[in-house]
Amino acid sequence: MDIPEGEEDPTFDFQVILVGFSKGCVVLNQIIYELSTVSAGVDPPLNDFASRISAMYWLDGGHSGESNTWITDEKFLDHLAKHVPRIRVHVTPYQIKDATRPWIGKEQKKFVENLRSLGANVKVKVHFQDRDPSLAFHFKLLESF
């Protein structure tokens, strides 16, 4: 947004809530990598944006790759844990109990464990946990979160 010189950005104090669903959680992961540079102070606009993030929601994160669906490296999770007040993880059996992609459930569990060990305010909800993994319930999560 182009703001005339001398005028205040009207969005400056807006809170930012980031939500990723399924493969869209890759974008949240990239933001985590970028946020790790905030403490270095090398990018003032990124610092301003990062300071306004009030919550991040992962909704049934997953992709077709064979690893790195969830970030588990504490080096990157540390900034997230310290600077994002609310971290929420909503998952279904479609992602965390898929026998053909067992790493997703393991990585998700490690992601949450590492954030908790770093002091993050993270909460997890497993939706449809009494159901078999199903693409239908994967999308139904969007109605129930």
Residue spans for each PLM region:
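Phosphate/oxyanion-binding active-site loops and adjacent basic polyanion-contact surfaces
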Residues: 1, 23-27, 104-107, 134
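Serine-dependent carboxylesterase/thioesterase catalytic core
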Residues: 2-85, 96-99
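C-terminal catalytic histidine-bearing segment of alpha/beta-hydrolase fold enzymes
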Residues: 88-145
